[in-house]
UniProtKB/Swiss-Prot annotation:
Pfam families: 2-Hacid_dh_C. It comes from the Bacteria. Gene3D superfamilies: NAD(P)-binding Rossmann-like Domain. The active site is at R227, H275 (proton donor). InterPro entries: D-isomer_DH_CS, D-isomer_DH_NAD-bd, GhrA_Enterobacterales, NAD(P)-bd_dom_sf. Transmembrane segments: none annotated. Its EC number is 1.1.1.79, 1.1.1.81. It comes from Escherichia coli O17:K52:H18 (strain UMN026 / ExPEC). Keywords: Cytoplasm, NAD, NADP, Oxidoreductase. It is found in: Cytoplasm. This is Glyoxylate/hydroxypyruvate reductase A. Catalyzes the NADPH-dependent reduction of glyoxylate and hydroxypyruvate into glycolate and glycerate, respectively.
């Protein structure tokens, strides 16, 4: 069994050694331009077209939760990957736990009005504020996949009203489910906090725009943990300036790194992190990949395969 590996920023040597230890029967090598030797599996992130084109691969593993970069390249270069080759993504590998930490900490930050107290502190103003009530602090999760379910589970502990929206209806205990475009308005109407965990597909690009924001309650909050292209930043800024949206916590942006001239940096109602909400944990990723390859070799059904038509 031959495995090729490519990631522009990861510690390649660590990954090669870890994979060799986890899959001792495999010959693992770092792919370099000009390497056309046979391979059974490819582990990649933002791979060059030539790495995958023309290969008879058993599977490709994207080294992250998103596969939009690979799918966008496939549209421009359909010869890059044969339709018969299954594409897998890292569904969790520690990312679910990180998303839980991020979402819970930020929801509690808003619920306890720490954002308001920070603004008061900036002007040396001492003023206790009325508390929010849980029953009026409904949290809506856009995107009900593996990470969305993890976030919902963690927020249930805090007894907030929860709802989710996705392409198909879910049956999560304690979570009100909405499905399809025809139910999006009803879903949004009660969301005091909107958490975005949608996949990046042509249908979801720009989905958080003026029209969507207008359907939220006045003074809602936005937490974007998915992709920057989901948000029309000018529409969000206008909503923040008007008070329609009271606050936004943004981990992802249309352009990354976020340009220094972006007005998001200095907006008093915006908090920013540099795309760190959930990062790939190498040891857990290697364990998942080695387990999945073993299942594929045995002809077993496995989780995490991407539906190329849907984009996730």
């Amino acid at each position: 069994m031959d495995i090729i590996f490519y990631h522009p920023t990861f510690d390649t040597q660590w990954w090669i050694e870890a994979l060799r230890k986890a899959i001792p029967q495999a010959r693992v090598r770092a792919w370099k331009s000009g390497d056309n030797d046979p391979a059974d599996y490819a582990l990649v992130w933002h791979p060059p077209v030539e790495m995958l084109a023309g290969r008879d691969l058993k599977a490709v593993f994207a080294l992250g939760a998103g596969v939009d970069s690979i799918l966008s390249k496939l549209k421009a270069h359909p010869e890059m990957l044969k339709p018969s080759v299954p594409l897998f993504r890292l569904e969790d590998t520690g990312m679910g736990e990180q998303m839980q930490e991020y979402a819970v900490s930020q929801v509690l930050h808003w619920f306890r009005r720490f954002d308001d107290y920070r603004i008061q502190q900036n002007s040396s103003h001492w003023q206790p504020l009325p508390e929010y009530h849980r029953e009026d602090f409904t949290i809506g999760i856009l995107g009900a996949g593996v990470l969305g379910s993890k976030v919902a589970q963690s927020l249930q502990t805090w007894r907030f009203p929860l709802r989710c929206w996705s392409r198909t209806r879910k049956s999560w205990s304690g979570v009100q489910s909405f499905a399809g475009r025809e139910e999006l308005s009803a879903f949004l109407s009660q969301c005091r906090v909107l958490i975005n965990l949608l996949p990046n597909t042509p249908e979801t690009v720009g989905i958080i725009n003026q029209q969507l924001i207008e359907k939220l309650p006045d003074g809602a909050y936005l937490l974007n943990l998915a992709r920057g292209v989901h948000v029309v930043e000018d529409d969000l800024l206008a909503a923040l300036d008007s008070g329609k949206v009271k606050g936004a916590m943004l981990d992802v942006f249309n352009r990354e790194p976020l340009p220094p001239e972006s007005p998001l940096w200095l907006h008093p109602r915006v908090a920013i992190t540099p795309h760190v909400a959930a990062i790939t944990r190498p040891a857990e990723a290697v364990e998942y990949i080695s387990r999945t390859i073993a299942q594929l070799e045995k002809g077993e059904r496995v989780c995490g395969q991407v539906d190329r038509a849907r984009g996730y």
